[in-house]
Amino acid sequence: MSRVAKAPVTVPNGVAVTQNGRQVEVKGTKGTLSFNLHALVELKQEEGKLQLAPVKESKDAWMQAGTARAVLNNLVKGVSEGFERKLQLIGVGYKAAVKGTSINLNLGFSHPIDYSLPEGVTAETPTATEIILKSADKQLLGQVASEIRGYRPPEPYKGKGVRYSDEVVLRKEAKKK
């Protein structure tokens, strides 16, 4: 049985949650997000709290309720506070610059990479080797950060590449003669 589903989701002031059948929509200062509830899960709204419960008592229903509760909590947090992800560019000549809705990346290739940001994600570069991505949608933010990191993932010998700011790169020792 999922213990995650038993905890209610607290809805802060300024966030509105509406349910239309299986579609749940969350509106806040940072935008509007929505998702579809699983058929085994039902949503109950009380003043300032959302409670998810399985329709019937089964292991699968509790698993889906726990997942739906985590997703709903991320939606509420996203539209009220937002999420951010920091990337670091480590390597000689590695640079990033934001131009409108795209990021220009120089990652040691013979050509620069222009990464077009999807709608709902913003980027800023406080320094040439640091990228800060912000979004209300946690899943989309993680996907964008992963795609940027995928152009030049950190290599284990020198640690060069694009990495998350909280990522620890395991270093290998060079081959000895």
UniProtKB/Swiss-Prot annotation:
<dbReference type="Pfam" id="PF00347">
    <property type="entry name" value="Ribosomal_L6"/>
</dbReference>
<dbReference type="GO" id="GO:0019843">
    <property type="term" value="F:rRNA binding"/>
</dbReference>
<dbReference type="GO" id="GO:0002181">
    <property type="term" value="P:cytoplasmic translation"/>
</dbReference>
<dbReference type="InterPro" id="IPR019906">
    <property type="entry name" value="Ribosomal_uL6_bac-type"/>
</dbReference>
<comment type="function">
    <text>This protein binds to the 23S rRNA, and is important in its secondary structure. It is located near the subunit interface in the base of the L7/L12 stalk, and near the tRNA binding site of the peptidyltransferase center.</text>
</comment>
<dbReference type="InterPro" id="IPR000702">
    <property type="entry name" value="Ribosomal_uL6-like"/>
</dbReference>
<keyword id="KW-0699">rRNA-binding</keyword>
<comment type="similarity">
    <text>Belongs to the universal ribosomal protein uL6 family.</text>
</comment>
<dbReference type="InterPro" id="IPR036789">
    <property type="entry name" value="Ribosomal_uL6-like_a/b-dom_sf"/>
</dbReference>
<dbReference type="InterPro" id="IPR020040">
    <property type="entry name" value="Ribosomal_uL6_a/b-dom"/>
</dbReference>
<keyword id="KW-0687">Ribonucleoprotein</keyword>
<dbReference type="GO" id="GO:0022625">
    <property type="term" value="C:cytosolic large ribosomal subunit"/>
</dbReference>
<protein>
    <recommendedName>
        <fullName>Large ribosomal subunit protein uL6</fullName>
    </recommendedName>
</protein>
<dbReference type="InterPro" id="IPR002358">
    <property type="entry name" value="Ribosomal_uL6_CS"/>
</dbReference>
<dbReference type="GO" id="GO:0003735">
    <property type="term" value="F:structural constituent of ribosome"/>
</dbReference>
<keyword id="KW-0694">RNA-binding</keyword>
<comment type="subunit">
    <text>Part of the 50S ribosomal subunit.</text>
</comment>
<keyword id="KW-0689">Ribosomal protein</keyword>
